[in-house]
Amino acid sequence: MSDIALTVSILALVAVVGLFIGNVKFRGIGLGIGGVLFGGIIVGHFVSQAGMTLSSDMLHVIQEFGLILFVYTIGIQVGPGFFASLRVSGLRLNLFAVLIVIIGGLVTAILHKLFDIPLPVVLGIFSGAVTNTPALGAGQQILRDLGTPMEMVDQMGMSYAMAYPFGICGILFTMWMLRVIFRVNVETEAQQHESSRTNGGALIKTINIRVENPNLHDLAIKDVPILNGDKIICSRLKREETLKVPSPDTIIQLGDLLHLVGQPADLHNAQLVIGQEVDTSLSTKGTDLRVERVVVTNENVLGKRIRDLHFKERYDVVISRLNRAGVELVASGDISLQFGDILNLVGRPSAIDAVANVLGNAQQKLQQVQMLPVFIGIGLGVLLGSIPVFVPGFPAALKLGLAGGPLIMALILGRIGSIGKLYWFMPPSANLALRELGIVLFLSVVGLKSGGDFVNTLVNGEGLSWIGYGALITAVPLITVGILARMLAKMNYLTMCGMLAGSMTDPPALAFANNLHPTSGAPALSYATVYPLVMFLRIITPQLLAVLFWSIG
């Protein structure tokens, strides 16, 4: 058998063994995709014992390409929500998550200096302790750029594997400990979270208001500032027994009922200007109007602003709200449409059908992947990651590398959505498949390279010490920030658990947090809020630590 055939066969065996290990669960918790790393270690141990020779060049290419696939698909997935997560609504959560990253970096630096841990080893421990595989890839690349021998670089994967198991268990232990310390009642926390969502400003709400302000009588909707802005959409108007879709030129009269869509604070302001909320239904049932959700798939409307499509004027159809990447938005006239946007339309059936034809509404297109944008994005990401940034006093130029470059490019392209007829939307199933393929390839190679010396290091070497260092890097930031968030910020416990899981980019921890109260969406919401920024920081941090430690000797 040729070296290439043998290498591919061994990698396939690693994937099978690793995925099997990852699917084994204890009380609902398993290693997940991280099991591939340990599958690689097991197979790598026996490969080393058997004296087999694998193609090192091929392994290197597969490892790097797997990493690129993984970080690129992550960026495309979270890109639409990344910049939104940095706004005020998620600012507090992101600040606490960033603090966890910073404290973790400080603990790593202190351990490195106190115990004189070799640089590749301490970076591997850091990456494993925070259960972040792209951080491992980024650290290995910067070490190679700094001229570190390959046998030392490979030690990073071994120390990563030592620290990884407690990285997963440590965050679960932290959640449990914080629950005990603060005597948390999970049911009460879930109710408080739901109440804050109802009264807060993050959700899109609807309200029916009766026009009671005499100053508004006989005015067109476009002449009422609060109704002509981008914060509130008036999607229905009921006069006596007639329900219709209002246009900007529609004249409102005293006693009219308006169905408004917007954030709670804006709807409250509308009440103060227009009149009181009423309990009367403005449902389209039994009328000649209907409400329908339509998906944007027509390449000709991508990038166009809603107001430039003139749906109100041409078709008498109102877009009441827009869902983008799972986030509900008010359908402001200035919003540019992206592939995969889901619009709520209100109007007559024939008019809605006409608008749906304009927008595309081709469900089958959502399952198709445009491969050209994928490779354009990957190529641009690799180029971005290869750009050197020279900093005075640093021994090597800083680069985003094969982990950071594709990630940042994917975040940008995911946020832009489309350029001309190229769109970077990727069906969730396709995104997940490519992401899983990438991480399996990457971890398989890392495990294979680490397997030969793993058992000896654990039994006769410093493996147990590495596990202890990793436990500190995992636990100290999580416990510190958890206590601060609860005591100082009075953060909801379920929200805090999601934030802690997101700060470690740890899906098993999110699954554990979700199981604390299966009907509450608090953990998933906070996890998604901090995940994009933290993933970026986790990839950059080992590179900064490597250059810093290298420069100060």
From Swiss-Prot:
Gene Ontology MF terms: monoatomic cation transmembrane transporter activity
Domain RCK C-terminal positions: 191-276, 279-361
GO cellular component, one term: plasma membrane
Keyword check for Nucleus: no
Annotated SUPFAM superfamilies: TrkA C-terminal domain-like
InterPro entries, per database record: AAE_transporter, RCK_C, RCK_C_sf, Transpt_YidE_put, YidE_YbjL
Keywords noted in UniProt: Cell membrane, Membrane, Repeat, Transmembrane, Transmembrane helix, Transport
Membrane topology, from the record: Multi-pass membrane protein
Alphabetized PANTHER family for the sequence: K(+)_H(+) ANTIPORTER SUBUNIT KHTT, TRANSPORT PROTEIN YIDE-RELATED
NCBIfam families linked to this entry: PRK03818.1, YidE_YbjL_dupl
HAMAP family, per the entry: YidE
Annotated protein name in UniProt: Putative transport protein YidE
Biological source species: Shigella boydii serotype 4 (strain Sb227)
